[in-house]
Design a protein with these regions (language model features):
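Short amphipathic alpha-helical segments, especially helix-boundary/capping motifs
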Residues: 5-8, 115-117, 147-151
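Eukaryotic partner-binding/assembly regions in large regulatory complexes
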Residues: 57-145
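Long, helix-rich, hydrophobic modules that act as membrane-proximal anchors or helical bundle/coiled-coil regulators
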Residues: 120-279
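Membrane-inserting effector segments that mediate pore formation, membrane fusion
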Residues: 7-83
Length: 279
């Protein structure tokens, strides 16, 4: 990534602070008390707290994308994701997590860095994210990848694209099965066997099936190993043919949960969707 001039960096820092403050209402609604940047120390945006490489990326790409947008609500969504990204980056730095040094933030001749490309993609997705509860999790993607050299940039783009495609309710389902309530799932399976029930119908059923199709939600076999839907006899016709107590996140599903911080989804949101699943 090329060097910013001092004047340019300072101007972008002021613009970034302004656009985040202009998004403060949505930030409060989406992230609540989790975001402490607005009105906070100038160092958060200047790079002293979050790390210079990631802050430069957020500052440069954030201002550029924000200024391209003409619709105020889209600008607020982008400002919200930028605030989340800065806050997460600052928290990770405070926890002693090290920024990757494998070239993720380096630009080449006439080429932007992988970090810049990924952030632009996430921000453009965020601008059109009408399910605004997703914004907190879209904002987590760059700071997560910034400290995960084990995740290649191409995989990072794939994860960001997946996060864009999924609905909020699919986010919640993944969060539930990151730590599944096995006793409740077992009781549900027994009730379904007795009553001959088929589980929920409509959109939720289709959304869960789609998580299996995307390779994010799988099933355990007789050895307790998790595999994709279709890898066991009873999952040949789809995930709903398998007792729910055997549903598990795949490796890809766990990766998305980690990168997008889906484990932070509230207990209230999880309970609401879980009750629908168990119906």
């Amino acid at each position: 990534m090329g060097e910013d001039s001092d004047d340019s960096a300072e101007a972008d820092s002021h613009r970034l602070r302004d656009l985040i403050e202009n998004s403060s209402d949505l930030i409060g609604a989406v992230a609540g008390g989790a975001i402490g940047l607005v009105g906070g120390p100038a160092g958060s945006i200047g790079g002293a707290a979050a790390g210079v490489a990631i802050t430069k990326t957020i500052r440069r790409v954030g201002v550029e994308v924000y200024d391209r947008l003409l619709v105020a609500r889209q600008q607020e969504r982008v400002g919200t994701v930028l605030a989340v990204a800065l806050d997460d980056a600052q928290a990770r730095a405070a926890d002693g997590e090290k920024i990757r040094d494998d070239g993720f933030f380096d630009s080449g001749e006439g080429q932007r860095s992988d970090a810049e490309e990924l952030l632009e993609g996430v921000l453009l997705q965020a601008a059109n994210a009408y399910q605004e509860r997703k914004l907190r999790h879209l904002g987590a993607i760059l700071p997560s990848l910034a400290v995960r050299p084990d995740i290649p940039p191409a995989d990072g783009h794939w994860l960001a694209r997946l996060a864009d495609r999924l609905t909020w309710r699919q986010f919640v389902v993944l969060a539930i099965f990151a730590n599944p309530p096995e006793e409740r799932l077992s009781l549900r399976d027994i009730d379904q066997d007795v009553s001959g029930g088929m589980g929920p119908t409509g959109g939720l059923r289709q959304e869960v099936e789609e998580l299996g199709t995307f390779g994010l939600l799988g099933v355990t076999n007789s050895n307790g190993e998790t595999g994709p839907v279709g890898s066991t006899y009873d999952s040949a016709s789809g995930i709903w043919g398998v007792p729910m107590v055997r549903w598990r996140l795949t490796l890809q599903g766990r990766l998305l949960v980690d990168v997008a911080r889906l484990a932070d989804i509230s207990t209230t949101d999880r309970e609401s969707v879980l009750n629908d699943l168990l119906a």
